[in-house]
């Protein structure tokens, strides 16, 4: 991860780690704060509706990849989803060399269930990352392919 971040900083020195491993307690706190913010922004939302909306950009405790230690959020800015698209494209291109993939790519929400996140990278190993990138596969699509090959 340190090598990947260093390589990203060679592309843009302002690239920095925003989040890595998260405990269940921290993910609970973060998730609940997002739900409360959605309800404050739209008082007509029920808690269930707010949770459904939140789950398009943050996972509930126990479901977040950050709890595995395999996911990182990194960007050039502190406000997520505001990085320069050209810079993100360059970082996405080098990610497989370090075993990472952009976890929730643009146009793949139907596969991942999560909207585009230009900051969220997942470690899958170099070989898998290179294959997934070459074939434009999400982790979900890649896992289906692996299961089919083992049949």
What is the predicted role of each segment?
Residues 1-150:
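Cell-envelope/glycan interface and biosynthesis
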